Amino acid sequence: MKTFREALKWAENYALAADKEDSAVKLLLMHVTNKESYEILADLNQAMADSELEEFTRLVHIYVDESVPVQHLMGYETFFGRKFIVSDAVLIPRFETEELVANVLVTYDEVFDGENVKVVDVGTGSGAIGLSLACEEANMEVTLTEISEEALAVAQENAKNLEASVTFFQGDMLKPLLDEDLKFDILVSNPPYIPLLEDIDPFVKDNEPHLALFGGEDGLKFYRMILKDASKILNPKNIIAFEHAWNHREAMAELVREHFPEARFETLKDLNGKDRMTIIVNE
């Protein structure tokens, strides 16, 4: 029989010895015991139930020995305060993307000041961006597009769990929207942006869908696709918001000037101080 402290210490050391993140095993402990972090801290000297210790040990071994993301083991990731189901069919939502959602909400308040607006999340994956916006702002009517049937199913399940009333289209980037001749006030997207030949963490490369990772030879393929046709699906007064690679600031600025020469736009840094988002406003 082990205490919470002993089990956590073993798991952290086991993870670190294999060059894995020790913080991840705490998430597994919270998941298995259905406890919050502060509850585990309060119970550190208490004995773990045998069944929970066995399950925790099993999951730690899978995480460390087989390099399976903890989010896949738990079946979810927390994003903007809500649980989103994830699988190997979708990109695991990142903390940086929460900042994109927050900045879209701020820009919406500045530009539309509480008006009813139509929003589209292009290439939604798990639905984290679009569904978070729908849940946060009642005046946003949200549509989500996704090319992958498997990813779309995950997003639809998340919408059901969150009781979010949204519309889904399956298709590549803007194509289903163009086919339906739809118009929107806000377009938001976090498309695949890793260049094809770039070396990336094997843990990411081996566990996340390449369809959601790679953005062509220079990582800008999908931004070009979206910006080329964006004016066809947007009302004259609009917001376009992208997440992108930290080193794509100047390339994104050039694309914006090419397709929206009259727009005002700004590149925003994430909490790590990296250029991560470009917000475009047409008024």
Language-model-derived ranges and their functions:
Residues 11, 100-104, 108, 226, ...:
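Generic hydrophobic alpha-helical segments
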